[in-house]
């Protein structure tokens, strides 16, 4: 007994040390604690919690540790305890809750009870702790306020506590919550019951019937939101934000009241900023999650806009602002930043059709206000709504731009800054139309603003706006301004370099260096004349700017040098390439000493990749130096944590952590530092593999080992995309090592790629993975997939197609929704486009499999056949029919003559769809009929005969050559050629040929153009009388066809077809008179094209 007491005493000391501010003591205590067996931990912790004479901090610490133990290691610890110990723990916890007098301690024990209850619901939903439920019911109707609080706290923490009995107890739960929400005497009970109600609704987010059943709790809930805010407690308001985010439909019956309350709280300046911003967050969140529902309440939206603008006016006067050299991060808690962000999101959520007419007048009034804060807010508001109101603002952009440019001359520097901001934002939001319309005014105004020497913040922001402008500016528009731009940028750079040396200021210089880089990037080879003006100074900065506070400047200068090098090309850059490489190598050697957050790292990594593009194969020599740090950065592992709500309260986003709510009181946290750098590094590895090919072979093994696991790196989309992109490129690099090495590498990636197609949650990333997988199969060819691969892939593709049809049905349901409007239709169209894009990737994968495996793969394909047949049904949307036909085109092209087995499914639709209203469907059908003639066996002959008049009808229709129809028409012309070439006995070739010649050349569809030119060569080389005409009278027409093909770049000079065409021309050249006659009938452009063909083929 004494030994146990001594051990418990030791444990109290340990708890004290776990709370120690001394890092060494605390670390040692954590190690000791970790080594105590789980069952002993439970005993010690419970004993500490029970002991009311122990220090308060130690008891609270014990409660937190016990909850964490049950949360993270329940299965290892609890089931192994003897059943009497389990029973004792359960009754002990309920006893402590009833006896505990300290409110905060009671809460912590309730958290333990909730955690235990969560783990005691079995797989069938049975609650294995009936005494816990009984305690809940007894306590909630107790006279003791502490016990009522405890019951609500447990229910809030674990709303699923009723398990499979929830439906049975639904009315009881509702009564319990209503009763507590009406408790006028105890605000804490009202607050807790409101939070518990929200938690319960959120836990049942897909149960629409339950929303209706609980709708009458909403008025009481909203009252609790209001009351708690005025008691300086925003927890219920946060619950309302969560409901707006996750289950906005629950709010529908009382949406007006919800919005009115949020509006009132947002506008009440007696509340603190955080509460007002949270109230605004309710409305803004609804504009994102229930836009159609909110659009019906235009009165609220109209009242919310002035509130956001009023917040944006809430700015501090700051004497040092204009010449601060360090850019402090925006104060994200400030009303001004919150208002601007809310406005941006609301404009995107609700759309410009609603928002712009409401806000336009407000902004115009603000811009005329004598107080600078209003003018600043008005301009920032214009910047914020550009993305959401894009379509509506485009129509009045001229007056907006003219007005904004006036404010670049405003007497107040912060207004001039905001005007730069608006110009920069519009240059991005409305590119390239903005640049095309306003280049003259904008460039002149920004260059003038950059001369504002007394206000470097304004100067720097004008340079930043210029960067935005030039990044998206068409090269041809920028060229006329180059002299003037360069002159200004150079003089400012020289001046700011002096200031850096004299005063140490660098803010403007950082931006100007990037402006130079951006101009060079757009101007490309036209920047050559200015190269020598900038390069010496830029090299000087990299050599000398070695102090810690100049790291960003140095990084940006490295970027600038590499972008200029890429712009001017290898020949001009070579004079400095060796110097620059030495500078970079020196930086690289110091790389290992750099701190992880050093801004130079990502600039360095990107610069190396640009140097690789400039130097090509010569870059290979630098790989040993570059690859170490690059792999180190690409291998960064982010800090992650699984936290429950209690732990969350001690964390904040300011520490660089971001959280995702997983429901059930759990959150997933990730420290985001280093993620962008990791993504950049992975993209650079892709760049090296692409540029260096076999020169990168030495590194393929380590890179593939890094990249394959990154297909599951769900913290950053860019990393997964780079991982996927790298796979086929790495296989190409590895080819030189021979088939065995290549196959080993493919085996290492294949499983992971197939699994990633099945599990990838983001459609943009998924399409990249599918595309890469298809490319890999093309590289590896026949035999690269085993039976297990085929089985898994078949299941995944089947699931993707089924999901495609299911999503279409869901969209039809949404079109019947009471809130359906034209903006909803726009977002449904976007979803549809996403789905179709995935369908194109399914087609890509099947194409690569058919082209590699031929007819051997048809038995496997049969599991997908009903779904592909469904795609080409007449009632399906045109993209479905287009891609369904493309898949059958591949079956015919690669699996004939065996493909005829499936002809009953696709032949009739294919013949029918040649005349479809949609050009994309016509094109896919026509291509199919062409490959049917080319590759199909004799069984297809009668269908070639049937196809011909249908194809001719499309070609001869009046609008067959318009932009949207031309590709389909050219496929029809090519198909007619293939029928004549490969199935000549199915049609009257003599009759069709003159028509076919009159339709040539093809110039849009380059692949089909080559096919038709090859057939034309066959006919000419065999001296076909109809083609050449009596006494070669058709030759001038043939020359004209060849010349047009050359002019439209339909003839690739490296293609054997080009040599055949050139030989036709040369033969005519030898018979003088005929040559003169042919050439005489060509225009000067056509003559030049014939000469170009002769020179190059």
From Swiss-Prot:
Classification via SMART domains: TOG
Keyword set, alphabetical order: Acetylation, Cytoplasm, Host-virus interaction, Nucleus, Phosphoprotein, Protein transport, Repeat, Transport
InterPro entries: ARM-like, ARM-type_fold, HEAT, Importin-beta_N, Importin_beta, Importin_rep_4, Importin_rep_5, Importin_rep_6
Modified positions (N-acetylalanine) in chain numbering: 2
Disulfide bridge partners, by residue number: none
Superkingdom field: Eukaryota
Coiled-coil spans in chain: none
Principal subcellular localization: cytoplasm
Cellular location(s): Cytoplasm; Nucleus; Nucleus, Nucleolus
Importin N-terminal domain boundaries: 28-99
HEAT repeat placement: 5-38, 43-77, 95-122, 130-157, 167-201, 210-246, 254-289, 298-350, 352-386, 390-430, 432-472, 475-523, 525-568, 570-615, 617-692, 695-737, 741-780, 787-853, 856-895, 903-935, 943-983, 990-1021, 1032-1067, 1070-1093
One family name in Pfam for this protein: Importin_rep_5
Gene Ontology terms describing biological process: cellular response to amino acid stimulus; cytoplasmic pattern recognition receptor signaling pathway; negative regulation of cell cycle; NLS-bearing protein import into nucleus; positive regulation of protein import into nucleus; protein import into nucleus; ribosomal protein import into nucleus
GO cellular component, one term: nucleus
Residue numbers of Phosphoserine PTMs: 827
Region Ran-GTP binding, annotated ranges: 325-375
Gene Ontology terms, MF aspect: GTPase inhibitor activity; nuclear import signal receptor activity; nuclear localization sequence binding; RNA binding; small GTPase binding
Subunit structure: Interacts with RPS7 and RPL5. Interacts with RPL23A (via BIB domain). Interacts with H2A, H2B, H3 and H4 histones. Interacts with CPEB3; this mediates CPEB3 nuclear import following neuronal stimulation which enhances the interaction in a RAN-regulated manner. Interacts with AIFM2; this interaction likely mediates the translocation of AIFM2 into the nucleus upon oxidative stress. Interacts with STX3 (isoform 3). Interacts with SRP19. (Microbial infection) Interacts with HIV-1 Rev.
PANTHER family (UniProt xref): IMPORTIN BETA (PTHR10527)
Family label: Belongs to the importin beta family. Importin beta-3 subfamily.
Biological role stated in the UniProt entry: Functions in nuclear protein import as nuclear transport receptor. Serves as receptor for nuclear localization signals (NLS) in cargo substrates. Is thought to mediate docking of the importin/substrate complex to the nuclear pore complex (NPC) through binding to nucleoporin and the complex is subsequently translocated through the pore by an energy requiring, Ran-dependent mechanism. At the nucleoplasmic side of the NPC, Ran binds to the importin, the importin/substrate complex dissociates and importin is re-exported from the nucleus to the cytoplasm where GTP hydrolysis releases Ran.
Name of the protein in its database record: Importin-5
